[in-house]
Amino acid sequence: MAELPIAPVGRIIKNAGAPRVSDDARDALAKVLEEMGEGIAAEAVKLAKHAGRKTVKASDIEMAVKAA
């Protein structure tokens, strides 16, 4: 089960131009976003550790996204 709230995920789809969004579509996008987010976060943690830090910074996230 996805940890992301469903309502904001539905709004993302609506902001992309969909007049209506099914529950299945919201659930599917939430799952994909969560999987992508976990992958990016894991890479950001590696970058922070490599830099000798325990704290993940925004720059780590940005670098992880570019590396993906």
UniProtKB/Swiss-Prot annotation:
Top-level lineage group: Archaea
A Pfam family this chain is assigned to: CBFD_NFYB_HMF
Job of this protein: Binds and compact DNA (95 to 150 base pairs) to form nucleosome-like structures that contain positive DNA supercoils. Increases the resistance of DNA to thermal denaturation (in vitro).
Subunit structure: Homodimer or heterodimer with another histone. Dimers then assemble into higher oligomers, with the DNA wrapped around the protein core.
Keyword Cytoplasm (UniProt): yes
Keyword Cytoplasm among UniProt keywords: yes
Annotated GO MF terms: DNA binding; protein heterodimerization activity
Assigned keywords, A-Z: Chromosome, Cytoplasm, DNA-binding
Chief subcellular location: cytoplasm
Protein name: Archaeal histone A1
InterPro entries (alphabetical): Archaeal_histone_HMF, CBFA_NFYB_domain, Histone-fold, HmfB-like
